[in-house]
Regions:
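Short beta-strand-to-turn element immediately C-terminal to the catalytic PLP-Schiff-base lysine
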Residues: 4-6
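Gram-negative outer-membrane beta-barrel transporters
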Residues: 10-22, 30-32, 37-116, 136, ...
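C-terminal beta-signal and adjacent terminal beta-strands/loops
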Residues: 20-22, 60, 109-116, 126, ...
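Residue-level "hotspot" positions that anchor or transmit function at local structural transition points
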Residues: 43-45, 82, 121, 125, ...
Length: 177
């Protein structure tokens, strides 16, 4: 169920969700049988319940966007939090437009989560900052420069899973209009 407001240069969305799932396939380390490796397994009954807020606006030449999510990802059989699912997550973005140049920043923040079904291995929350610049030099051609994880943050979405450090991208894009 959701509500939406569009007006006066503002877009706001509020959504409540309640999903009951049967035979949900999830991943965990170690496996429920105790073997110390990551494996997929079945959760008989699960509930994903929560609330999402999102909004966007433009202030002069700056576009602003934000989203916040709160959820209770629950294994209904055990009553525990589902593995590798944070209860809180947020995204914030701003970009500045000046003619054919657009530059921006994105911040992603994720709360802590458990790496395993018994909820004994907690993974820390994290925040990542990304920066980008796009130059549209013709209607069809643009150049993109991007840096993800600017602070070179070490973080885990799964125990001992190698996530990217600081990453640089450059791309030339052609789009048929």
């Amino acid at each position: 169920m959701g509500l939406r407001y569009d007006g006066n240069g503002y877009n706001l969305d509020a959504t409540y969700f309640h999903n009951r799932l049967t035979d949900m396939i999830v991943s965990s380390t170690p496996c429920p049988d105790g073997v110390n490796r990551s494996c997929a397994y079945n959760v008989n009954e699960a509930t994903l319940e929560g609330f999402s807020l999102a909004g966007s606006t433009r202030l002069m030449d700056v576009n602003l966007r934000a989203s916040l999510d709160w959820q209770d990802p629950r294994d209904d059989t055990t009553g525990r939090q589902l593995a590798r699912r944070a209860k809180k997550h947020a995204n914030f973005a701003a970009d500045y437009v000046m003619g054919q140049l657009k530059s921006g920043a994105e911040l992603t923040v994720s709360g802590d989560r458990f790496d395993n079904a018994p909820n004994t291995n907690r993974l820390a929350g994290y925040g990542l900052l990304n920066l980008y610049t796009t130059y549209q030099f013709t209607p069809d051609w643009s150049l993109l420069l991007r840096v993800n994880n600017v602070a070179d943050k070490n973080y885990e979405v799964a125990r001992n899973y190698g996530t990217s450090g600081r990453t640089w991208f450059a791309s030339l894009r052609y789009g048929i209009r």
